[in-house]
């Protein structure tokens, strides 16, 4: 499941960030913004007509990212123990 598959308001945990055709530079940039494994991420808004996805990383950082980048962020739901 990817970040783009989440509905608005859903919270998941980042599983992995894939480089895709962007290369390792994208992975490094997203990690610098706080998107890395086992970090909670929430979809706040999805723009219409293929626009960006607005997300919250952790409890404070908000950013907008291209849909093509959001597809490269693999997520999972935190399983209660």
Task: Please provide the spans of the model-predicted regions.
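Tandem CBS (Bateman) regulatory domains
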Residues: 2-3
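C-terminal structural segments of small proteins and small subunits
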Residues: 10-12, 49, 54-81
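Short alpha-helix capping/helix-loop boundary micro-motifs
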Residues: 23-29
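Short, charged beta-turn/beta-strand-edge "cap" motif at the junction between a beta-strand
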Residues: 18, 45-50
């Amino acid at each position: 499941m990817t970040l783009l598959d989440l509905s608005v308001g859903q919270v998941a945990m980042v599983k992995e960030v894939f480089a895709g055709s962007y290369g390792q530079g994208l992975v490094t940039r997203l990690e610098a913004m706080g998107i890395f494994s086992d970090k909670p991420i929430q979809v706040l808004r999805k723009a219409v007509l293929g626009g960006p996805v607005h997300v919250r990383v952790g409890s404070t950082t908000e950013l907008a990212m291209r849909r093509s980048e959001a597809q490269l962020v693999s997520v999972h739901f935190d399983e209660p123990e």
